[in-house]
Amino acid sequence: EPVFLEAYLPRLRQRPDILLANLALEIQCSRLSHQRFVERTKSYLNNGYQVWWILGHSFLGQRQFSLIEKSCCYYNRKRGVHCWKADLKNQKLYLYHHITETVSGHISFFSSCWTFSGNDLKKIFTNNEIKINQMKKTERLSEDGKKWLARQLIYKQKNTVSIQEQCYLRHKHLLYLSPWIYQNSRFFFYLREQVFLYRMLYEESLKQQKVPDFSSWFCQVKEYKMQWLFPMIEEERVYRQFFDECTHLSSWKI
């Protein structure tokens, strides 16, 4: 299959670093505004291309992900939430997969590595391979959701105060909700503190319907949800999985 370097795509007015058929590979070494990143990504996707963002050495060096780093993430069942990084000096490609985040933003993940030479890059991207023998996991930090919320209220953190206001409108208090609402979530990565609000909305649906319906719950969520920041991840799919998590946790006897 032919490989084109910096091939110009006139309809998109974009020039990917590498073009493999309909796969546009972008190696992002310098900082890029989130708006421009989203524009470029959607331009590829809307014109029938897959886009593979690979971050350079200046990215993914902190315990918390920046907005751009999060937006470069993908999702599938085998790799979970994942993203890519290139070490151009040592000619290695890293996959950070099964990424999770605590409520305070600390990131945990597994990593796998390939050398550039002797490997089919397109196959690596599309086959969902994980090199089990090279997996490494960062320290997972667990946090008490209620204690974290209490600290945010003390410091009058804007998003948390906004959720508290929604509690007040319902004659509730953010720190005195059902215990399951404060449990850990694999959706903090996407939703951060909104997890607690959406769980409260789920519980309201549970009391009204006994068996909550995703569509009616999601209609409620849409009134409060923030802009979706992950152009390579299907939004509704994530919310359906979050809904399933609510169903599971709310059945616990805590």
What are these regions (language model features)?
Residues 32-52:
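Basic, amphipathic alpha-helical patches used to engage nucleic acids or provide basic targeting signals
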Residues 73-254:
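Non-catalytic C-terminal interaction segments of nucleic acid-processing enzymes
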Residues 16-33, 44:
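Conserved catalytic cores of phosphodiester-cleaving nucleases, focusing on short active-site segments
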Residues 10, 30-32, 57-60:
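Short acidic/polar capping segments at secondary-structure boundaries
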Residues 2-24:
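Active-site metal-binding core of divalent-cation-utilizing nuclease and nuclease-like domains
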Residues 47-81, 88:
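Nucleic-acid nuclease catalytic cores
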